[in-house]
Every structure is written in C-alpha cells, then in structure tokens.
Curated annotation (Swiss-Prot):
Name assigned to this protein: Dual-action ribosomal maturation protein DarP
Segment forming the signal sequence: none
Family: Belongs to the DarP family.
Gene that this sequence comes from: darP
Keywords linked to the UniProt accession: Cytoplasm, Ribosome biogenesis, RNA-binding, rRNA-binding
Organism phylogeny: Bacteria, Pseudomonadati, Pseudomonadota, Gammaproteobacteria, Vibrionales
Functional note: Member of a network of 50S ribosomal subunit biogenesis factors which assembles along the 30S-50S interface, preventing incorrect 23S rRNA structures from forming. Promotes peptidyl transferase center (PTC) maturation.
Cross-referenced Gene3D superfamilies: PSPTO4464-like domains (1.10.60.30)
Length: 179
C-alpha cells in the first residue's frame, strides 16, 4: 500500500522558510561596520570597557588589541570584527552612544546653570527661592549678596567677579547633588 501525497499538499519536512537574500556587498558593509564598532571599543579605557555587555572572548580580544602595534593590531581588529558577528551589536552601540553623549549632556547642564545664574541676577529673590527649593543646602544670603553685587558690577562696567562666583557656587551644588 503506497501513500501518495496530494499534489497541492506539502510534507511537513518540506515547509518553506522565508529566505531573506542579502547581497554580498551588503554583507561586507555590515562586517565593516562591526569592525569599526570594534575599533571604537579598542580605543576605550579598560574601566569604561568593563561596563559594556561583551562576551569573554570579545573582551579578551579587545584587551589584546589594545596592547598590539601596527600589523598585529590590524589583524586583531579583523578578528574582533569576526567575533562581533556572533554578538548583538545593539546593546554595545547603545552603551557607546551613551558615553559619547555624556559630554554633550554635561555641556547642556552647564548651559542650564548659566541661564539660572542670569535669571538670578535679573529677577532676584523669586529665582533664588527656586534654587533654594532645588538645593536646600545653598546659602540664600550669599546668593542675594552676589546677585546685588553682580548687578552693580554690570552697571559700572567692572570685571564680573560676582557673576562668576554665582556660577561656581551653582556648579558645585549641581555636582554635589549627584553624590
């Protein structure tokens, strides 16, 4: 007794899988991108690199590449690119972007402090109260004194000593807030 498959029916082992065709050039470009990501990782300090989600083999290869020179380093970078193919690059890329943006975030925070200082000098007590709410350890009397002094310096075209001092105090408060 023979079992014959119907013409329109497929056997379970013949199921079609969706095959995504990728050109050779696209594959090479992806590999180059992974190698460039690996190069950026090699350029990082070991203390920063410790925070990245990397496999042990990749971490060891990166540490080796940091010690190598010239041609050995080039070959090691290619090896890192090969190891990166087995890794998920997204978490690594996100961690790298976070480190890159740290500088711009610090700059933005300093710009906010400068704006706060300018408002403190122009508007006076209302803004000083805002600062006191945000930083309860701040010296209200010192801020008032410096704000008045900064206005006088600006009016008489003197060097902005109090202006700078307000900023330094705000910066110290901001930096100590994170601790």
């Amino acid at each position: 007794m023979k079992i014959m498959a119907r013409k329109n029916q497929k056997a379970p082992w013949e199921e079609e899988e969706e095959i995504i065709w990728v050109s050779k050039t696209e594959m090479k470009n992806d590999m180059e991108d992974l190698q460039k990501l690996g190069e950026e990782l090699v350029g990082l300090k070991p203390s920063v690199l410790a925070k990245f989600p990397l496999s042990d083999d990749l971490r060891e290869a990166i540490n080796d590449a940091q010690r190598f020179k010239n041609e050995a380093k080039r070959r090691q970078l290619q090896f890192i690119g090969k190891l990166m193919r087995n890794e998920d690059p997204e978490p690594i890329q996100l961690a790298l972007d976070k480190i890159r943006n740290k500088h711009s975030q610090a700059t933005a925070a300093l710009h906010k402090l400068e704006t706060l200082r300018d408002r403190m000098i122009e508007e006076g007590d209302a803004v000083i109260e805002e600062v006191m709410v945000k930083y309860p350890d701040a010296d209200r009397q010192r801020f008032r004194q410096l704000a008045r002094q900064a206005k006088k310096e600006k009016a008489s075209n003197k060097p902005p000593k109090a202006f700078r001092e307000i900023f330094q105090i705000l910066k110290d408060l901001y930096l100590n807030e994170d601790l």
